[in-house]
Amino acid sequence: IKLLTCRFFKERKNMKNIIKLISVSLISLLVAFSSANASSGVFKLSHDLGFGKDTNLDAITKGRLFQVVIMTQNRLVRKNLDGVTSPELATDWSGNSDATEWTFNLRKGVKFHDGSDFDAEDVKYSLMRVKDPDIGSPAKKSMSSVTDIEVVDSHTVKMKLNTSFADFPLLLTDYRLRMIPSGSGDTIGQTGIGTGPFIVEKFDAEGTTILKANPDYWEGAPGLAEVHVIAIPDGEARVQALLTGQIDMNRYVPFAQKKIFDGNSKFNVSVVPTGNWRGMVMRTDTAP
């Protein structure tokens, strides 16, 4: 059994208080992906509806529903548990002598949820779309050095940069750079179609979004049959939902509420350091 782990942040409040945001999950639930066992069980988690009516399933937009897109769509490259860049939909990659061109070989036999094949044209479409000024994607900075993506063949792409960049593959681990079917930009916000382990059965940003296991997932069918992502805007209500069994996991719990779960054998508190940081902006034209 693998327990869900989530990110942990520290930030200052009123110059003195440190708030630790902690995620809790039920110990007894199996959430590991496994092709050895049939998909079974329903896992329920919450989101805060932070983008309101603009909440959608398009990973490159400001209103993306993070909890869903990470389960329905894949990237080319990801980080493993040690933080090392590793293959996802790209099997391997290499740069030229001055690191201004990067060639990525793509995984073969991968299909989108609509049954279409994943190929190099989808990669070019998905990533160049991030640069579209009409979309105004918050992720466009990750693609700012890319001037062109050449489709070498059906499962090879060459990305051309405007400068040398030895760590370019690391940029592609950006959680927003997900692969979608070529030409699906107008509908992806509602369908969420990708190559991931779960398929969107029903999208309801203000209610419950239902995901079903993808039996044809390229890493093997997930261990869960369904995931329900429930909108609960109020933080206190999310904690109560966890305590009463309405949800199985809450990604962030204020430090002051951590004591509710300490010593409770039904819950596991996972504190996971990350590279995230929070800045505090201060005026410099007036005295403290």
Q: What is each model feature region?
A:
Residues 18, 37, 105, 139-181:
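Surface-exposed binding/hinge segments that line
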Residues 41-49, 101-104, 123-126, 157-158, ...:
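Short, well-ordered beta-strand elements
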Residues 46-97, 128, 193-194:
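N-terminal lobe/hinge region of extracytoplasmic solute-binding protein
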Residues 91-136, 152, 158, 241, ...:
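Aromatic- and charge-enriched surface segment that lines or borders ligand/interaction sites
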Residues 172-222, 226, 236:
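Gly/Pro-rich hinge or "lid" segments in bacterial periplasmic/extracellular proteins
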Residues 186, 215-260, 275:
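Ligand-site clamp/hinge motif
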Residues 212-215, 274-288:
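A bilobed periplasmic-binding-protein/Venus flytrap-type ligand-binding module shared by bacterial periplasmic
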Residues 259-271:
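Ligand-binding "clamshell"
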